[in-house]
Amino acid sequence: KHNPASEILSGLVGSEMCIRDRKEGGNAIDAAIAANAALGLMEPTGNGIGGDLFAIVWIEKEKKLYGLNASGRSPEDLTLKYFIENNFKSIPAYGPLPVSVPGCVDGWFELHNKFGKIKMRDILSPTIKYAEDGFPVTELVSYYMKNASDNFQDYPNFKETFFIDDSTPLKGQVFKNPDLANTLRTIVKSGKKGFYEGEIAHRIANFVQDQGGFLSYDDLKNHRSEWIEPVSTNYRGFDVWELPPNGQGIAALQILNLLEGYDIRSMGFGSADYIHHFVEAKKIAFADRAKYYADMDFNEIPVEYLISKEYADIRRKDINSENSAPTVSPGNIENGDTIYLTTADSEGNMVSLIQSNYRGMGSGMVPEGLGFMLQDRGELFSLDENHFNVYAPKKRPFHTIIPAFITKDGNPFISFGLMGGAMQPQGHAQIVINIIDFDMNLQEAGDAPRIRHQSNQQPTGGEMTDGGELALEKGFDYKQIRELMKKGHSVIYDLGSFGGYQAIMIDYINKVYFGASESRKDGSAIGY
């Protein structure tokens, strides 16, 4: 019998609510929904019911992984022609135009209907209580809310929902959101129809359209999540799992496939040799990401070929071990966005879940009286009509948020994730390498200094012409940095944007869970 249960997520209060659900007879799936609901209230800077959700679920009795894509689609009445005729070069970051259907609530019910044990009323009641009675705002959330407020103060209902008196909440202030409490009560009473049909859906659609947007009641009513098969590659005997596009998870698998051809262990963690090869592999994976990753309902994307060893062997020939590549083209495939949480229970079930509004709080669109902000994922469409990720009605945008999972010999090993936009697949690959190649434990793998490469080559357009920038977190040796510069890398120091990692590992023989949550963000590992 599995003795422990474990939850790792942002914020101690949210973690405690997970454990409460588990003690009252819930399982890892119930706990994940409870945690996500709590974080939507307590960390509106990263997620909420106005956003999307992705999950990978391990069901022990079936020895099977399930994948859930709960991302929403673009408005049916908004066309590419509208953007072109109005001279848009890209879709705006804020306002009504980047708003797509929020998929989170439907994702909750898909997870709950398939795997949940206790009633949704019991899952959401703690969050409803905290929304009514209030909770102390943490230092980090206070900081991010203040930063975000500059973008949103002129939008209707933002101050009424997220301000205390004349400003965003300060550290330690008790914040209440009674409107969100009422929205969650409606969801408890009427299920997902209470959100996607009826008064709430009408309020959302009417508000967005009043602000000049196109999201309609029918867009909300017709929304459906999709159960999908996770995809994997084997890295030195471990199967690493991600979800296929419209997300970016397979970039991590491409990076790992490319690096498997090198003796990473002998290079050593933090060496110029390792960092150089990692960055060059990342450039190749992200060149494909920029061109091919998009909604698979609109494109024939040979995912299995992109993550194959055969393709990696071809692309690895483009890596120069001595020099940084200034430009990288996507491969020829004709032959072939946040909070993260993870939960586990005494039955051996595990959930890897990530959820986000994109750009922190989202679009700035706060429908009156509902207590949440709508996401702005639509910003991540391209307006190039020849691009895989070109905008189209009823299409899912490219997504940055990705959950991950590792199995070994058909058994669960690690449920993990890492927040942070384009950092996510880079971070996933680094966590895997830290554990498998560099023999780090679960906590060390997250605490180790990270590498982040960035360039203009994105799924919305742009090209890398100068090799991009290599950002290194504090902790790397200066001699190694000089060697990287000699290889042609443009190296910068950066204190932020290296993601936020959390994980649960299971010792499958002894039936013991290990948890890890890093210091780059609020978060905790808790169990009973």
PLM features per residue range, with description:
Residues W227, N335-T338, H399-I401:
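Short, small/polar residue-rich loop motifs at catalytic or cofactor-binding pockets
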